[in-house]
From Swiss-Prot:
Major location category of this protein: plastid
Subunit structure: The 4 large subunits of the cytochrome b6-f complex are cytochrome b6, subunit IV (17 kDa polypeptide, PetD), cytochrome f and the Rieske protein, while the 4 small subunits are PetG, PetL, PetM and PetN. The complex functions as a dimer.
Organism listed in the record: Cryptomeria japonica (Japanese cedar)
One GO BP annotation of this record: photosynthesis
Keywords from the UniProt entry: Chloroplast, Electron transport, Membrane, Photosynthesis, Plastid, Thylakoid, Transmembrane, Transmembrane helix, Transport
One GO CC term, this protein: cytochrome b6f complex
Cell location: Plastid, Chloroplast thylakoid membrane
Family membership noted in the UniProt record: Belongs to the PetG family.
UniProt GO MF annotations: electron transporter, transferring electrons within cytochrome b6/f complex of photosystem II activity
Name of protein: Cytochrome b6-f complex subunit 5
Topology within the bilayer: Single-pass membrane protein
SUPFAM superfamilies attached to this UniProt entry: PetG subunit of the cytochrome b6f complex (SSF103446)
Length: 37
């Protein structure tokens, strides 16, 4: 039961972590474009 709970937490955190990294990189990319202008 504990293994199932841990696996569920990991599977739930992975997409959130990837989404957070993607959004952060996207915001930094747009900020760089604005500075170039």
């Amino acid at each position: 039961m504990i293994e199932v709970l841990l696996s569920g937490i990991v599977l739930g955190l992975i997409p959130i972590t990837l989404a957070g990294l993607f959004v952060t990189a996207y915001l930094q990319y747009r900020r760089g474009d604005q500075l170039d202008i």
